[in-house]
Amino acid sequence: MEVKQISESTIKITIKLEDLEEHGMEMADFLVPQEKTEEFFYTILDELEMPESFLDSGMLSFRVTPKPDKLDVFVTKSKVDKNLNFEDLADLPDMDELSQMTPDEFLKTLEKNIFEKSRDDIDAVQMLEKAEEEDTSEPEEGQEQDRYIYYILRFSDLKNLIAFTKTVDYPVDTSELYKMDQRYYLTILVDIEGRPSRYPAWLLAAMREHAEDTDTTRALLQEHGHLLIVTDAVQHLQKVNC
């Protein structure tokens, strides 16, 4: 494993496949958020010699970029713990009003105030995204073809979505179903190792015959969409009669 300081608040950890195997992990574990992956990230942080700037950090954000033979993990520390002063929360409702709130209403009110007082935390996340974009925009020498490729398709209704899944006659590693802005989005992960170089383009052309290609990213769906089926969405929907 290797650690690279991207900025004061962002580092990149490169994890090789053999490192994953030693920790009982595999690429598929990172396709959907789960407690197992979060525990793995913090285990890695304990094992590595972290920069001093991260030793006193509070909240951390993780973003994963799969590569053919490794995993790049971008870690950004939150600045909210350094800049949030509870005296700044004086504009919370008074005690009488708080006493009338349900626990959920109180937590939402507190969360809103903390969010408004912690703009630096947003800056930290944006810095992570910028660092990732700059890092992945520079191709490595002798870089091999990616083993996995993601397709994201958009559907206006469930009927068209289900009809599409019944046309899928090629291997799919995993798939997810999201709903956002009254549209359905299907993410499909395909293993293209050992396939001809034109195989990804052929797949996309076949998909476009029954579905709408989109520039919407999986990160956007994860942040703003509703995850309806966590894994094997294609296989589950193929069983539905319409």
UniProtKB/Swiss-Prot annotation:
One GO molecular-function entry? protein-macromolecule adaptor activity
Gene3D superfamilies reported for this sequence = 3.30.70.1950
User: What is recorded about the domains?
Assistant: The N-terminal domain probably binds unfolded/aggregated proteins; the C-terminal domain interacts with ClpC.
Give a short account of what the protein does: Enables the recognition and targeting of unfolded and aggregated proteins to the ClpC protease or to other proteins involved in proteolysis.
Quote the subunit structure annotation: Homodimer.
Q: Which family does it belong to?
A: Belongs to the MecA family.
- Its protein name is Adapter protein MecA
Q: Which species does the entry assign this protein to?
A: Streptococcus gordonii (strain Challis / ATCC 35105 / BCRC 15272 / CH1 / DL1 / V288)
Source taxonomy: Bacteria, Bacillati, Bacillota, Bacilli, Lactobacillales
